[in-house]
């Protein structure tokens, strides 16, 4: 998870720049 930073993109298309799995699995 993560906040919807792209406007509706699912988690698997969110950029690691904003969604680092080490920080927010």
UniProtKB/Swiss-Prot annotation:
Inhibits protein synthesis but does not possess ribonuclease activity. Also inhibits HIV-1 reverse transcriptase, beta-glucosidase and beta-glucuronidase. Its EC number is 3.2.2.22. Residues 1-25 are annotated as: Disordered. Belongs to the ribosome-inactivating protein family. GO terms for biological process: negative regulation of translation. It is an enzyme of class 3 (hydrolase). This is Ribosome-inactivating protein velutin. The keyword Hydrolase applies. It catalyses: Endohydrolysis of the N-glycosidic bond at one specific adenosine on the 28S rRNA. The keyword Disulfide bond does not apply. Keywords: Hydrolase, Protein synthesis inhibitor, Toxin. GO terms for molecular function: rRNA N-glycosylase activity; toxin activity.
